């Protein structure tokens, strides 16, 4: 615990779960940036507690979270998550033993994934300017295709049968649609695109569509349109300026947000927020990239997605000035050409982190 914690106005308790691979690298970088932010501003403090709920620990002891893990997390204001996944553990085990239970048990039914092109970076799309790509993807985060229902019968025979059941509920759909409409209403263009596959999936997705249009009646100031998910990938590539706020199911948004990140320059810059809008449980913030075992521990991971996620966390905590300042620092650093290799630069994780910390001190502390 920081030694000066008693002297500040506010203390934000943060549960840190670095996880696996570069999750460890970028979480270390993010906590350093956050501590710099609080030190310079002097209006709040972070109290970080790190939980070793990694795949390495799982292989040693047989579990990711302890039985009371979710209860432990509920004691914190927010959760900062690095990444999960390691070659020695099947992906479905690592996901369903850690991040998915957290999202579900803590009612984090909204996943927000903003996408934009940062200064000094460029999209792989020809002639795509910064102002041409400015999206927010709102992902249903608690049910749908990731409901976890199903099973495998006759698994060890030649006649194995597997089911993966998607569950869509009226309540679940309506609450994500209202959040998406509120998000669209808060943005200048007031435009919401709903993604579906109701032409082929004739039950759950038909209900998805129906609830969308019902909720739309309460938002006459928000313009709407509907896209089949396959056609949506084409539109994102060919007509990025036609999009603004996007709402999609758990699976569809998971895929589309990775495409969005790539179109903005690199998946390494993309943030996400797992929110409980009721604020009865801590929300969780994480970059959308994976654990990247091939570059883990090499000090070359792009920390921008981690910093952007940290900025979203700070904003959620009510520290608007700090969040805006952190985003300004990130933008100034990328504009100056301080970037990792995936963005066309030559810096490593530490170099970008140093630059962002220095920029924070310059913006808030008057440093040169």
What are these regions (language model features)?
Residues 43-66, 236:
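N-terminal beta-loop-helix "entrance" segment that forms/cooperates
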Residues 58-163, 251-253:
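N-terminal glycine-rich phosphate/adenylate-binding segment common to multiple enzyme folds
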């Amino acid at each position: 615990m920081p030694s000066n914690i008693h002297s500040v106005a506010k203390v934000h308790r943060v549960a840190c779960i670095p996880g696996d691979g570069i999750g460890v690298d970028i979480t270390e970088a993010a906590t350093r940036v956050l501590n710099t932010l609080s030190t310079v501003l002097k209006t709040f403090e972070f109290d970080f507690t790190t939980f070793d709920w990694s795949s390495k620990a799982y292989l040693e002891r047989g579990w990711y979270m302890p039985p009371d893990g979710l209860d432990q997390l509920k004691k914190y204001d927010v959760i900062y998550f690095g990444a999960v996944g390691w070659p020695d553990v099947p992906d479905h085990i690592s996901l369903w033993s850690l991040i998915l239970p957290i999202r579900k048990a803590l009612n984090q039914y909204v996943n927000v994934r903003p996408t934009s092109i940062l200064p000094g970076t460029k999209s792989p799309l020809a002639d795509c300017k910064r102002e041409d790509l400015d999206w927010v993807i709102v992902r249903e985060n608690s049910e749908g295709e990731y409901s976890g229902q199903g099973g495998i019968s006759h698994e060890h025979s030649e006649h194995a049968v597997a089911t993966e059941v998607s569950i869509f509920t009226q309540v679940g759909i309506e609450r994500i649609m209202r959040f998406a409409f509120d998000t669209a209403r808060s943005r200048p263009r007031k435009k919401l695109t709903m993604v579906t596959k109701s032409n082929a999936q004739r039950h759950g997705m038909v209900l998805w569509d129906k609830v969308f249009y019902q909720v739309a009646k309460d938002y006459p100031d928000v313009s709407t349109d509907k896209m089949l998910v396959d056609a949506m990938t084409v539109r994102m590539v060919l007509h990025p300026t036609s999009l603004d706020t996007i709402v999609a199911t758990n699976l569809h948004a998971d895929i589309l947000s990775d495409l969005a990140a790539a179109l903005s320059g690199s998946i390494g810059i993309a943030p996400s927020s797992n929110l409980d809008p009721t604020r009865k449980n801590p929300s969780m913030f994480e970059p959308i990239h994976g654990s990247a075992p091939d570059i883990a521990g090499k000090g070359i991971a792009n920390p921008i997605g981690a910093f952007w996620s940290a900025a979203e966390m700070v904003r959620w905590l009510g520290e608007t000035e700090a969040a805006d300042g952190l985003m300004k620092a990130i933008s100034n650093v990328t504009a100056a050409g301080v970037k990792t290799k995936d963005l066309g630069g030559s810096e490593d994780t530490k170099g970008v982190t140093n630059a962002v910390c220095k920029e924070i001190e310059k913006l808030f502390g008057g440093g040169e």
